[in-house]
Amino acid sequence: PVYGTLKPVRTWNPVIINFKHLWQLLKDAWHAERYFDKIRIWFMPTGWRPADVKEKFPLLEVTNPAKQLKYNTNNSRWLFAYSWTQLVITHLLLFHLLIIFSNQSNAMNYLYAVVLLLSVFSFTSMLDNNNYAFFAELLKAGLVFALLSIQDLSWYGLQGISVYLFITYIIFSLVLTFY
């Protein structure tokens, strides 16, 4: 058996993958000529599209999985190593968030989650060879430094050498993404 989606997403970025389907539904609802179809699209089974939209705006669909070309961005070994390192660090930060979750306000927990989301968005955008990886990393660094400022140079309970190592990681991450 072959597993996967019938409409290839052509990205490594899980944030884009999650919103790509919603965006497609919004576009289909916008382009549908009949008002009934504009509403019905939200309640129909997965894959259903109005006939007029299907005709005017066809989507690439996999009809024969055996002949499907795999998504390949021809990344360097360095980029794979960098991405794996980012993934491991992001997981460690996620574990930290889960450990201290009940000690923080919801707003602070959400901001920490946004930092993690920006991190994943950045390194997976690099895997896709997209230029906006740097802007995501820049936004992440700005949010991190704002949160460090709010918490008197503490990162959610981490202090001392741990914070300096974290700051070093953020700076290196930004510089390497720019490179």
Question: At which residue positions do the language-model features occur?
Answer:
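Cytosolic/stromal cytosol-facing helical appendages immediately following the last transmembrane segment
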Residues: 1-83, 132, 168-179
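Substrate-recognition/cap regions that form aromatic- and gly/pro-loop-enriched pockets
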Residues: 70-179
